[in-house]
């Protein structure tokens, strides 16, 4: 079986991770102690992708929980699914990174990283045929951003041929937790561009919007936001966890989604977005799902794909769906909105089907898009970064941990390069290349 090892780092990562495990335990018929009491053979068939089987019909998540302070871990352990995880897989420090990327990446985090790698190695050795790693973290803080990216690069060194998928919570434009978010995020993106294979960008503000606009929650809690993220994570990994007609895995997703190795930052969406209690009142159809899935309001990152073009995108449908209907709808979307898809990648929409819907729904769909509009997100962080870096504001927190200003400059220019690469492919057309070919034979006439 193709196993995935899951890492969660920092406060944000651990809370999203906990929500994710809660969601998929439910889908696989496990209770909060990991004991199987499901009804369907299909739940067991690929259980081993995320769970190790222990004695007595108990399943243990293949998860490594990392933080530089004990607080969040204790909360996870005390939470409803705290008894699910293997106690040895909690790795935590005492000091905290204090939202300082340098602490997470170079000082505090670097002291803890070998301990984490031992646990990762142990989990990897228990695998039959390891497919890759997934990591949940935020890019604005210290531990998730700094230590998360450190772990990614260390794992990359040790397992160079395995997939690395990250679910990264990007700082949002209006909702900010700390003043140094732009620094931490820029330094993290600098690492992710090089070391991750696929990064799913999630953004608190977009999640807030979805909760308020679509789910009509007047003051959403982080629990509600994490519930949305876990729905997407569960959707992206459905194909790996259940048999289906058209399966895809992390590597297939990457092959279909990443036209150029650096451009692997995806927007994600989920449909049907209904509040937790309302879904039982109406039937969902494939056309509705498709329409909702391609709706900018459903995107979990604060950038509007109407300002860019899709290089590629992938739709994962779950439930009793007719293959033909899905194909027709997807073709329909591409024909109607052809201006939003680049024309030099034919067939750039990939679909996958899985016959088992999420709990409480008849059918659902998860959307993953590689759109050039994601550059808005990097531009925004870049502008905030420049505004502070120009004045060298707050830099002493980083240089004090042994960082160099050069590193900041490098990270900044790497992110600017990323933005201009996206822009370049957004503007590229088919006709430009044809002109080049016509001009080539000219010198022979002389």
From Swiss-Prot:
<dbReference type="InterPro" id="IPR002453">
    <property type="entry name" value="Beta_tubulin"/>
</dbReference>
<keyword id="KW-0460">Magnesium</keyword>
<dbReference type="GO" id="GO:0005874">
    <property type="term" value="C:microtubule"/>
</dbReference>
<dbReference type="InterPro" id="IPR023123">
    <property type="entry name" value="Tubulin_C"/>
</dbReference>
<feature type="binding site">
    <location>
        <position position="69"/>
    </location>
    <ligand>
        <name>GTP</name>
    </ligand>
</feature>
<dbReference type="InterPro" id="IPR018316">
    <property type="entry name" value="Tubulin/FtsZ_2-layer-sand-dom"/>
</dbReference>
<dbReference type="GO" id="GO:0005525">
    <property type="term" value="F:GTP binding"/>
</dbReference>
<feature type="binding site">
    <location>
        <position position="69"/>
    </location>
    <ligand>
        <name>Mg(2+)</name>
    </ligand>
</feature>
<dbReference type="InterPro" id="IPR037103">
    <property type="entry name" value="Tubulin/FtsZ-like_C"/>
</dbReference>
<feature type="binding site">
    <location>
        <position position="226"/>
    </location>
    <ligand>
        <name>GTP</name>
    </ligand>
</feature>
<feature type="binding site">
    <location>
        <position position="204"/>
    </location>
    <ligand>
        <name>GTP</name>
    </ligand>
</feature>
<feature type="binding site">
    <location>
        <position position="144"/>
    </location>
    <ligand>
        <name>GTP</name>
    </ligand>
</feature>
<comment type="function">
    <text>Tubulin is the major constituent of microtubules, a cylinder consisting of laterally associated linear protofilaments composed of alpha- and beta-tubulin heterodimers. Microtubules grow by the addition of GTP-tubulin dimers to the microtubule end, where a stabilizing cap forms. Below the cap, tubulin dimers are in GDP-bound state, owing to GTPase activity of alpha-tubulin.</text>
</comment>
<feature type="binding site">
    <location>
        <position position="143"/>
    </location>
    <ligand>
        <name>GTP</name>
    </ligand>
</feature>
<feature type="binding site">
    <location>
        <position position="138"/>
    </location>
    <ligand>
        <name>GTP</name>
    </ligand>
</feature>
<keyword id="KW-0547">Nucleotide-binding</keyword>
<dbReference type="GO" id="GO:0007017">
    <property type="term" value="P:microtubule-based process"/>
</dbReference>
<comment type="subunit">
    <text>Dimer of alpha and beta chains. A typical microtubule is a hollow water-filled tube with an outer diameter of 25 nm and an inner diameter of 15 nM. Alpha-beta heterodimers associate head-to-tail to form protofilaments running lengthwise along the microtubule wall with the beta-tubulin subunit facing the microtubule plus end conferring a structural polarity. Microtubules usually have 13 protofilaments but different protofilament numbers can be found in some organisms and specialized cells.</text>
</comment>
<keyword id="KW-0342">GTP-binding</keyword>
<dbReference type="GO" id="GO:0005200">
    <property type="term" value="F:structural constituent of cytoskeleton"/>
</dbReference>
<dbReference type="InterPro" id="IPR013838">
    <property type="entry name" value="Beta-tubulin_BS"/>
</dbReference>
<feature type="binding site">
    <location>
        <position position="11"/>
    </location>
    <ligand>
        <name>GTP</name>
    </ligand>
</feature>
<dbReference type="GO" id="GO:0003924">
    <property type="term" value="F:GTPase activity"/>
</dbReference>
<dbReference type="GO" id="GO:0005737">
    <property type="term" value="C:cytoplasm"/>
</dbReference>
<feature type="compositionally biased region" description="Acidic residues">
    <location>
        <begin position="429"/>
        <end position="446"/>
    </location>
</feature>
<keyword id="KW-0493">Microtubule</keyword>
<dbReference type="Pfam" id="PF03953">
    <property type="entry name" value="Tubulin_C"/>
</dbReference>
<dbReference type="InterPro" id="IPR017975">
    <property type="entry name" value="Tubulin_CS"/>
</dbReference>
<dbReference type="Pfam" id="PF00091">
    <property type="entry name" value="Tubulin"/>
</dbReference>
<keyword id="KW-0206">Cytoskeleton</keyword>
<dbReference type="InterPro" id="IPR036525">
    <property type="entry name" value="Tubulin/FtsZ_GTPase_sf"/>
</dbReference>
<feature type="binding site">
    <location>
        <position position="142"/>
    </location>
    <ligand>
        <name>GTP</name>
    </ligand>
</feature>
<dbReference type="InterPro" id="IPR008280">
    <property type="entry name" value="Tub_FtsZ_C"/>
</dbReference>
<dbReference type="GO" id="GO:0046872">
    <property type="term" value="F:metal ion binding"/>
</dbReference>
<keyword id="KW-0479">Metal-binding</keyword>
<feature type="region of interest" description="Disordered">
    <location>
        <begin position="423"/>
        <end position="446"/>
    </location>
</feature>
<keyword id="KW-0963">Cytoplasm</keyword>
<dbReference type="InterPro" id="IPR000217">
    <property type="entry name" value="Tubulin"/>
</dbReference>
<protein>
    <recommendedName>
        <fullName>Tubulin beta chain</fullName>
    </recommendedName>
</protein>
<dbReference type="InterPro" id="IPR003008">
    <property type="entry name" value="Tubulin_FtsZ_GTPase"/>
</dbReference>
<comment type="similarity">
    <text>Belongs to the tubulin family.</text>
</comment>
């Amino acid at each position: 079986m193709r196993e995935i090892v899951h890492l969660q780092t920092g406060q944000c990562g651990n809370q999203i991770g906990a929500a994710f495990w809660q969601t998929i335990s439910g889908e696989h018929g496990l209770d909060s102690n990991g004991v199987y009491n499901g009804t369907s053979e299909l739940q067991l068939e690929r259980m081993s992708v995320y769970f190790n089987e222990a004695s007595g019909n108990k399943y243990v998540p293949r998860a490594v929980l990392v933080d530089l302070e004990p607080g969040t871990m204790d909360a996870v352990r005390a939470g409803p699914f705290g008894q699910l995880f293997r106690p040895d897989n909690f790795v935590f420090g005492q000091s905290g990174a204090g939202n300082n990327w340098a602490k997470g990446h170079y000082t505090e985090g670097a002291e803890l990283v070998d301990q984490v790698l031992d646990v990762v190695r142990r989990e990897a050795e228990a695998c039959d045929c390891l497919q890759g790693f997934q990591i949940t973290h935020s890019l604005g803080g210290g531990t998730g951003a700094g230590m998360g990216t450190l772990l990614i690069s260390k794992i990359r060194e040790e397992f160079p041929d395995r997939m690395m998928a990250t679910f990264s919570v990007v700082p949002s434009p209006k909702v900010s937790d700390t003043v140094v978010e732009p620094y931490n995020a820029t330094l993290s993106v600098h690492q992710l561009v090089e070391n991750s294979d696929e990064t799913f960008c999630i953004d608190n503000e977009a999640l807030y919007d979805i909760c308020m606009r679509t789910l009509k929650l007047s003051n959403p809690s982080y629990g509600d936001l994490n519930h949305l993220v876990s729905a997407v994570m569960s959707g992206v990994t459905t194909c790996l966890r259940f048999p289906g007609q058209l399966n895809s895995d992390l590597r297939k997703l990457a092959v279909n989604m990443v036209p150029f190795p650096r451009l692997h930052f995806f927007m994600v969406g989920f449909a049907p977005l209904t509040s937790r209690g309302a879904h039982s009142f109406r039937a969902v159809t494939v056309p509705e799902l498709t329409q909702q899935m391609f709706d900018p309001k459903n995107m979990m990152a604060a950038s509007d794909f109407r300002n860019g073009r899709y290089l590629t995108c992938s739709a994962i449908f779950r439930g009793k769906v007719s293959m033909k209907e899905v194909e027709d709808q997807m073709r329909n979307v591409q024909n109607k909105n052809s201006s939003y898809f680049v024309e030099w990648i034919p067939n750039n929409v990939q679909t996958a089907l899985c016959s088992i819907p999420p709990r409480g729904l008849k059918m659902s769909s998860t959307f993953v898009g590689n759109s050039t509009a994601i550059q808005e997100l990097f531009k925004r962080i870049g502008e905030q970064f420049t505004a502070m870096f120009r004045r060298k504001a707050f830099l002493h927190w980083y240089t004090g941990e042994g960082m160099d200003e050069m590193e900041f400059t490098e990270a900044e220019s790497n992110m600017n390069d990323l933005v201009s690469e996206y822009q370049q492919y957004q503007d590229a057309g088919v006709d430009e290349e044809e002109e080049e070919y016509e001009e080539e034979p000219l010198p022979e006439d002389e």
